[in-house]
Amino acid sequence: MSFARYPAYKDSGVEWLGEVPGHWEVVRLNTTATCNDEVLLESTAEDYEIEYVEISGVQAGQGITETATLPFGNAPSRARRVVRDGDVLISTVRTYLRAIAQVKSPPENMIASTGFAVLRPRRIDSRFLGYACHAEGFVSDVIARSVGVSYPAINASELARLPIPLPTAPEQTAIATFLDRETAKIDALVAEQEKLIALLQEKR
């Protein structure tokens, strides 16, 4: 599918972005979203049940694939980040795993590991934020800025200063809606393929 070109473009000043439409902004993440601004207090009742998301519970390209339900008193000390609808989770440790998730309709008691940066959209479409944080160039930037060999990590405050493109609000919505639709098509094709493979294996 081809799209009409914008009348004017400008250099974004960001290597992985290249040129962007002239009326777009290029901003730091922390100007469009908060980072780690809600935590579960240590004074929380020990019998309070949480739905815990560990780094291993988020898979590249799949989002949150696994959670653990347990009382706060039995949870690891890193179970602190409160997660809300529309948040984006980005792992700040072992960044090469690309553990990034757009959160949709989570339970009220969902808590993520402090190994995640929890981005909460402010002046940006939450879906567009999720897609921007999944962009190959952005993810590669996160990995490149990580420090350490066997356990590379990036400071959440540094991650929050990374640049992303910021179209107008209507464009953000249109882009996110288009990507939602195309992603759904791909997911449907993958599901059909998996079903076909399963049928072929049954016939062997």
Language-model region placement:
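Low-complexity, Lys/Gly-biased intrinsically disordered segments
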Residues: 5-6, 23-64, 69-71, 76-81, ...
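A short glycine-rich beta-alpha junction/loop motif
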Residues: 8-11, 93-96, 110-115, 147-173
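Alpha-helical coiled-coil heptad-repeat register
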Residues: 87, 180-183, 187-190, 194-197, ...
